[in-house]
Structures are given as structure tokens and as C-alpha cells.
Amino acid sequence: MDSQRNILLIALALVSFLLFQQWQVAKNPAPQAVEQAQSSSTLPAPSFADELDPVPGQQQASAKTITVTTDVLTLSIDTVGGDVVHADLNKYSAELDSSDPFVLLKDTKGHQFIAQSGLVGPQGIDLSSTNRPHYKVSADSFTLADGQDELRVPMTFTANGIEYIKTYVFKRGSYALNVEYDVVNNSGNNATFGMYAHLRQNLMDAGGSITMPTYRGGAYSTEDVRYKKYSFEDMQDRNLSINLADGQGWAAMIQHYFAAAWIPRNEPGTNLYTRVIGNLGDIGVRMPNKTIATGDQAKFEATLWVGPKLQNEMAAVAENLDLVVDYGWLWFIAKPLHSLLAFIQSFVGNWGVAIICLTFIVRGAMYPLTKAQYTSMAKMRMLQPKLQAMRERIGDDRQRMSQEMMELYKKEKVNPLGGCLPLILQMPIFIALYWALMESVELRHSPFFGWIHDLSAQDPYYILPLLMGASMFLIQKMSPTTVTDPMQQKIMTFMPVMFTFFFLFFPSGLVLYWLVSNIVTLIQQTLIYKALEKKGLHTK
């Protein structure tokens, strides 16, 4: 067995797997969850799609929008319906070195991504897209002042003796805002309403590149399904309708690094739904009806998250909301790695330096496996003369050859898989760390030093990938091999070139990790080889 060749093949398979997995995330989201059985709740919310116009008309023209500015958000709210039609993330720039903020929500001719909410039911005021309430406001703009921790933006509407107060509540430093309806019924009759809240976005392709495709689409959580993607293709195939028996869950539209989500206020019987209107897709929640007696009042409320995928903050807003940071099937490894990376960054103050420190920690922890790998390779190499003599003596009798080889391995106390098994055991860590780096919004537009101004983007001058390829070439040259077949030798020589090509388009933060990992490998390899030589295990 040529362990060096197998290690390189495993490494190539690892990169190919990562690329394929990225492509799968973007192009083929996981199959939809099986809907839960209907709750035994006596007042489940109806499917929202059943309450609207069969053929919705054009959204009625806005009378005006108001602007709300906090320390982290700048929102535009339409006074017709009270929807959030624009959202700037003040602490995140649209492009590197740009003064323009990143726009998450917007309503333009070419693209729509908005957060809508309203009241439906028998006396609903938001049943028709062409006849929504015109709210009155006290000002055209509202600002969270210095020293102020909370900002309330009330909007009022009165019809048929019923007063509606829709209030947006903002907290300092928070991307979560509350939407509250206070309804006062002075109509002389009972009135029944239920609140809905959904996100609407153009149906579109996932986008991204071959090495960094990104998922853009719906996602949700219920009491039975912690996290599930529901793509635009899924929405077009079938409308989702799930009854939340205990009212816990959320509905979101997600994309790389950012997300918007509606979280109901734990009202049993809430309906989680999707629907498609032309080229627009909705995902949201419809809460159960409440009947308000004349002379009485009631409150309806939900929480809207609109911002970056910040795990700790999202976890505090809603259970499982932090899972929109999708680490894949190795999340239980990737999440602690990300936490460790963030912990290191809090001390060193630079994400690139934190990646270097994390690499040394990970490779240090895996040193026993690395040592076992090289020791096994050295033992196998010393057996090569005996194995060659065995082949010449036995000839084409494969069964006998296999039997005598195993006896030789047992006698010499050598594991034939020892050179590959440690690397295979390390693969989950490599894959998990890959996803931890790919999914971290903290790395977006984060500089390292010199020419690396954005660890989430590819190296503009390809210096890191070239250094990574050179380090891989050095590892290959320093590693002894028994390969004599010319074709296999060419393949092994070409592999650093192939890896370099792949990494030209990878985020520089990931390439930095791989480069430092290779440097650590060179150091460990040198030290281990010297120790093995002292023990009489020849490495060449």
C-alpha cells in the first residue's frame, strides 16, 4: 500500500466533497419536512392563502413612507398597510470600502423583498392588497436618540368605530423589533381578527459561484422540526401549511450572511404557510383569531428579525433561530469551532490572526493522530522489500498473497490502514471548520493584513493560493514514496497544481487556514521523521 498516494487521493476527495456539498446546498435544498398532524387546539388559524383574493390585485400605491433610524437599522415603513419596505443594515457595508450600507429589504421595480403584516379574519382590514388601511403618523421620521434604549413608532387608523394602533418597537443594538397591534372596539358589535406576518420576495435562483454558491430561499422551524429549508422551487410545487400546536416556531427568508424572520408570540394553533403569487413567494405565520367584544380591546403581536446571522443574538430571540447559520450535518463540531474562533478573536482583535491561532490549536489537538499516521507509513515502508519478495514468490495467487500479507502485518504489528485511518478521522474536523469559516458573517469584510482586506472574499492577487500550492508541493517532496508507476507519479505531481486552481476562488480566510495547516504539517513532519529515524524507522 502506498500511503502517500492514498492520502493525496483522500485530500482530493475532501475538496471535491466540499465543492459538491456547496453546490448541493444551493441547487438542491433538503427535502421538505413532513407536516405535522393537525393540533387538537379548538381554534387553529386557517391557512392564510384561503382568506385572500383568489387573484390578488396590484399592491396599492403608497401614500408615503416614514423613516426609522436606530444605531443598527434604517427602515422605511409604508403608511399604507404599515409594511417594512426597505431595510439598511447600518453596521454592514454593501461593498468593501463602500460607505453605502447593506440593503436587506427593498421594494424596487426589479426586486422586491419586504416584511408585511396585518389583520385578517371576518372584520380584517388587510384582506385585499388593493384596499389596505392608510395609517396616520405623527412625523415623517423617527430616530433612536443617544442615551435612549427604546423607540416606539405608533401608526393609527380608524374605521367603522374601531381604532387600530400599529406600533413598531425598536431596542438599541438589536436587529429584532416588535410589531404590536392594539385594537379598540367601539363599533357596537363584536369584531374578530387574526394577525398575519410574512416575508415576500421574488422567486429567484440561488446565485453565487461554483466554489461559493449560496442558498437564497425560505426556511422555518416548528415544535417537531428544528430547522428546515423550503426553497422557492418547493413553494412553487406546493404551498406549505403547518399548524403549530404550541405556537412555537418561525418563518424566514435567508441568504448568505443575512436573514429576515417572523416569530409569532407562542399562540397555540398558529398556521405557518407559504404561497406563490406570480413571481413572488411568501413565507409567514397566521395567528389564531380573537373576538373583541364591543367596548373592549385586544393586542396582537409578533417579532421581526432583520439583520445579519448572529448566532448568540438570534438564539436569544427565538428557539432554533440561530440554526439559519447552517453548518450542515457536522454542526455539532462546527459550532464549537466557531465559538472558539470568536473567543480567540475577542483577545487578538483580528479574524485572520484568530484563524491562524485556531489552526495551531486544531493541528496541535490532532498531533497524536498525525504522529500515528507517519509512524504507520514508516513501518509499512520498511516492509516493502518483504512484500516485494512475497509477490515474486507467490505470483498471481491473490488469495494466498492476501493471507500471507495479513500474517506478515500481524507478525510485524503493522496496521495496513494506519497511514490513512488518522487522516480519515481528521476529515470531519476539516469539513466542519470549512463550514464554520464559510458561514461566519463576522469574516465578511474583515481584513487580515496587507493586501487581504476581506477574509470572506478570494485573494485578489492569488498570493495565498499560490503559497498554499507551494507548501503542498513541499510536503509532497518531503514525504517519501514508493510509487514507481510513471502515470501515478504524474498524477501526484499534478495534484498540488489542481488544488491551487481550486483554492484560487475560495475565500481567503479558508485558504489562510489551509496554508497555515500545511506549514504546521511541514513542521510536524520534520519533527516526527527525526524521532522515527532515532528509533530506527527509516522514513526514506
From Swiss-Prot:
Keywords: Cell inner membrane, Cell membrane, Chaperone, Membrane, Protein transport, Transmembrane, Transmembrane helix, Transport
TM regions (residue ranges): 6-26, 342-362, 417-437, 455-475, 496-516
Gene Ontology terms, MF aspect: membrane insertase activity
Reported function: Required for the insertion and/or proper folding and/or complex formation of integral membrane proteins into the membrane. Involved in integration of membrane proteins that insert both dependently and independently of the Sec translocase complex, as well as at least some lipoproteins. Aids folding of multispanning membrane proteins.
Matching CDD domains: 5TM_YidC_Alb3, EcYidC-like_peri
Protein name per its UniProtKB record: Membrane protein insertase YidC
Gene designation: yidC
Principal subcellular localization: membrane
